[in-house]
Structure formats: structure tokens, C-alpha cells
Amino acid sequence: MKIPGARRIAICAILCLLMNVTCLIIPAKAEGGFIRTSGTRFTLDGKPFYVVGANNHYLTFGSAREVTRVLDDAVAMHANVIRTFIQPVIGSLDGTTVPTIWDWKSKADASDLGVNGAYMLYWDTARNRMGINDGPDGLQRLDFLVAEARKRGLRLIVAFLDFWAYTGGAQQMRAWYGSRDENTFFFTDPRAKRDYLLWVREVLTRTNSIDGIRYKDDPTIFAWELMNEPNIRPEPLYRSWIEEMAGYIKSIDPNHLVGSGHANVSNKLSDLSIPILDFGTWHGYPLYYKLTPARFDRLITEFCEIGRRHQKPVLLEEFGFARSNRDQVAVYRMWLKTLHDNPDCAGWLIWRLVSLQDSGRFPKDSHDQFDIRNDEGEVWAVVKDAAKSGALRRYQND
């Protein structure tokens, strides 16, 4: 019987005490190597790795129980990758010197952005600069997520920030300096760029407080993303910022893949031509782009073909179709089959997997109605079956 790493360490520690000897306990390493690319495929240890999984937005601020429920449901779904972004970001801790531009004090469930006092970055009034919270309500939340994902054999795609202000993100960071410019200030102001670089370095070089593994050395991380949906304008600024920041990440961490995290629908994956990016990302919501399900299905094929032309993997890393649509089950079945059958499609991550909250209820999902739940319903069955077959997918020429 194979004993899990954490339990193995505990057993070793007990044995050392019983035998009255000093033991050197070496932290366990994640199983398997780092994810690589080969043409339009992701690979693991030289073999194709087809991405199947989901997004979850509260994994870095939900309670320990809420986080482990999501990860357990991901395992039940047969997922191999979960995507999230590091958040929240707030103003000054006194709440007044530099205001927080979103409702940090909300008492809502985690899924509805009740963060219960968690924050990663803040404005340090004493030092008049960005502060980083590495405590139990800060980066130790990320430590817990990574360690728990490893226990379950899950890989994580992690975006360093969110562009949007829902839990602060880049918008809170530009507000530290009094700016209201959402699309350019953060990406051009020397102070904001310095903050981002310091944050990236802090994360990459951090040693996990639970298992002792540095993030940049941890294969549990599937890939880093510069930001969730960096809506940078104009296009030349976007490309120059991506090139600069991706280069900085790789100068510190050559082990992991780097993606932009961009939605990339309107520009049709234009950033795939940036050499330093390892793979392409796109976020597909027919509702927001006024597309029929059939037109979106054709778009899947079109975007995977773009990947083939550039010889890079293309990942549909967000997509959703509201449960209020009577044909939701059939539409998901169609899209997932199209992705599965195309050898140039690298995989998919549905938006979004949610689990029981500490309130004992599932989130209300009254806004976009994209939530996926382990409720044994028809949608869950379709997604679960697609993930199971996708995780076992083999290419004809392998």
C-alpha cells in the first residue's frame, strides 16, 4: 500500500520520537515531471497530456473546507487541471488612507466574493508602497491550495492577478496611485510595473510553508498566466507588456509554461505569434459574443487550426452556456465532442466548477448561470464523461 507523502512524513516523525533519534525529514516532491509542449499538444514525460478540467475563482480565499470540496469534486469529475487566479487585492489596512474599491467586507459566500478577511496584496501606509501578506489569510492560502492539489494528482494553471476589480486585481493596484485608467495605467506606469514584477518574483521564489517546495520547482503548477483577461489597450502596448513580463517570469522560472490568460476571441489569438508565450488561451461565451451554439462550435475548430498554423497548443480555458437554455446539455455535448475529436485542440476548462459552501448550500448562480456542480444532474454527467474520455485520449499517430 502506498502511503501519501504527508502521512509518510508524520509516520516518520513519530517513529523518530519513539526511537529517540534525530531524523532529517525531506519534503515530498510532486509526482511526474513538468508539462511541456510539442506542436499543438501539451506533454507530460514525453506523452500527450490532454487538458480536461474547470475554473474556480475562490480557491485562494475560500475556507479550507470550501477549497477541498472543489478539489474533491474536480477529482470526481475526472479533471486533471484546475485554473484559478491569485486574489484578493485591497487598499490600505486602515480602510481609509487608500480605499479598497470593491466590497472587501462582504459577508456573502465565497462564490459570491465573500473573502472572509483574506487578502494577498495591500497598500502599506507605513512604507508608502505595496505590501505582501504571507500570513494565514494571505499567501498561506495559496500554499494550502497547491499542497492539496498535489495530494489529489491535480495540476494548477495559476494567473498572478485578475484584470478585473471584482476582488481588487490590477484595478485596485492602479487605484493605489489615484488612477482611474483601467486599460493602460497599470501597464505603463513605472510604479505599477515594479509592483507587478515584485509580486511575480515573490510568488515564483516562495517556498510552500506546508511541503517545503518552491513554487518555481513544483510540477503541480501546470503553467503560469500573466493575468486573467489582461484587457490592455492599444494592441502594441499589450504585446510589449506581455513580452516583457513573460520574459521576466522565464528568467526566474524556466521550468513552467507561460500563457497570457487573455480572452483572445475578438483578436482571434493574435498573441499566439509572440514567441515567448508557450500556448494560446481563449475564453468563449456565446452569450457575450452573440453567437449561436453552432457558430461557436465552428469557432472551436477555427481556433484549433490557428494553433496548428503556429504549432502551439490552444486551450479553451473558459467557456459556458447558461442552464436556462433548454438545450444546454446537448450544446455542451456537441462542443466537448468537437474539442475531443480534433487532434489540434489541446483541451478545455469549463467555467466554472463550484461546490457546497460553508453555508451548506450551493451558490445561487443567479447571474450568468454557468455553474457546474457535482449534483448528479445531466450537465454534470456530460462534463464528467467528456473529462474521463479526454484524460485517456490518445492520438492516432502515437
Regions flagged by a language model, labelled:
Residues 6-7, 19, 227-228, 383, ...:
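Residue-level micro-sites within transmembrane alpha helices that shape
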Residues 2-14:
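Bacterial N-terminal signal peptides that target proteins for export
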Residues 32-279, 283-291, 297-313, 323-330, ...:
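Active-site mouth of glycoside hydrolases
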Residues 360, 375-398:
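Carbohydrate-binding surfaces of carbohydrate-active enzymes
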